[in-house]
Amino acid sequence: MRYYIIAGEASGDLVGGNLIRAIHEQDTHANVRCWGGDKMETAGATLIKHYRELAFMGFVEVITHLRAIFRNIEFCKKDILAYKPDVLVLIDYPGFNLRIAEWAKKQNMRIAYYVSPQVWAWKEKRVEKIKRDVDKMLVILPFEVDFYKKWDYKVTYVGHPLVEVVREEKNNVPVISLSDKPVIALLPGSRAQEIKVKLPIMLRMVKYFPEYCFVIAQASAQPDSLYKEIIGEEPVLLVKDQTYNLLKQAKAGLITSGTATLETALFGVPQVVCYKGNAVSFWLATKLVSVKYISLVNLIMDKPVVTELIQGELTEANLKTALTRLLQDEAYKKELKQDYETLWHSLGDKHASVNAAKEIISLASGNV
């Protein structure tokens, strides 16, 4: 059967890559066309657009790129029509994918959505469009089942795809040592604009902790030059395509909010969650977003498990205080370890990619 899959960010590429492998295992004649990244292409899909051409974050940034966004939407529609998929699979990326879903429904296409938009955080009324346009919603967070139940919309919890990825990495991939010193991981994000804002603040920690080796996880879609310009003469390491190897040996991490916070927690690394965006975008977000926390770890656990330094709170002094606590407060580290274990078990031992592929293949076969 023919599968058209759309992911617009690095996290979606990771999820999509594992999904595509699972689809090929269950449907040996599968033909997959996608918008995504290197992982999806490596898994066996024909890559049409790379997410680095699509990833705009924040209200202001989206507005300034509206022409490119609408051009991509029109190109996507034409490409889907030409391909004639048995099922359209949308992975997160709601600003783009919900528009495509509305259009595709009018074309009488079968539509699966894997990784729900965070409608529980903001613009909750989008659920009405999801109910109208999406045939099968596959969620990855346990609390999303009850959220959608409020809207009388039955969804399928398949498990969190990161659990299976991290389990495989922990069990089967040996650690390659990065330094003789204990390591602190810096994950400044995958988009150029967020790296330019957060990495300089993270690098200010180097002088306070000379007994540690600071290692930056380079986003695969970003050039070396972006990082080297920011790093300057700082004595740090820059590694590419080694994020999990880095997390397996890190004593602590300074982590950009997003999927990386959950990955870091699943590897058991004490972390400080860092967020700093465009001032106008952040102000608008505070008016529209209705969640207590910014990190997935705290959202899932429904309590402040990890420290979040958001916008004006992300200062050199605050970051130093938070990192010192991670490295030196043994009671806090013990409590954090226990919370991380609870988090792991709350996400279950489901095989998300296999379960999602099964549901998608069933839908492609005409079973809604």
Task: Label each PLM-derived region with a short phrase.
Residues 1-368:
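Nucleotide-activated sugar donor-binding and catalytic core shared by glycosyltransferases
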